[in-house]
């Protein structure tokens, strides 16, 4: 990513920290071909440019595997199964399904390409599925009101 983007992120994370908040970023945990033999994972790029700043990473990686697809397991896979060991949240299914990444788990999605909650027979609610390391992975304001 451009240096200006990283400078903005550092300033934003620092500004939040000064007011008692911890930043969280929603970003790709998927390998991307940047061309000319260069590949990146956005989460790794952000993390390496933020240094030791305390940031919560909410990554998406709906590619099957590692994503299980549109399934609601009793014990969902941990965020580290996304391929990003420091992820606090992993979005492993999206609606509508991204066909280029989910061909191996297409059968887990509805025929219309969306993911629905079990029991949603009316298909009223598009569903994205996530797992997290805790019930409150961003820790809110650290307990402050």
Task: State what each model feature region is.
Residues 5, 34-46:
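Distinct, well-ordered alpha-helical segments
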Residues 1, 35-37, 99-101:
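Short, solvent-exposed polar/charged micro-motifs at secondary-structure junctions
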Residues 41-145:
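Functionally critical loop-and-helix segments that line ligand-binding/catalytic clefts
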Residues 1-4, 13:
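Second-shell loop/turn segments in exported
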Residues 16-36:
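Aromatic-lined carbohydrate-recognition surfaces of secreted/lumenal glycan-active proteins
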């Amino acid at each position: 990513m451009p240096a200006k983007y990283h400078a903005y992120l550092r300033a934003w994370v620092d500004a939040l920290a000064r007011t008692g908040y911890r930043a969280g970023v929603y970003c790709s945990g998927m390998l991307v071909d940047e061309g000319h033999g260069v590949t990146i994972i956005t989460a790794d790029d952000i993390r390496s440019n933020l240094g030791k700043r305390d940031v919560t990473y909410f990554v998406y990686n709906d590619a099957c595997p590692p994503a299980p697809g549109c399934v609601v397991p009793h014990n969902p896979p941990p965020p580290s199964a996304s391929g990003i060991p420091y992820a606090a949240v992993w979005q492993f299914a999206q609606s509508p399904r991204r066909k280029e990444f989910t061909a191996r788990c297409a059968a887990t999605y509805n025929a219309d390409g969306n993911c629905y909650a079990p029991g949603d027979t009316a298909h009223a609610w598009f569903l994205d599925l996530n797992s997290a390391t805790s019930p409150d992975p961003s820790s809110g304001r650290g307990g402050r009101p």
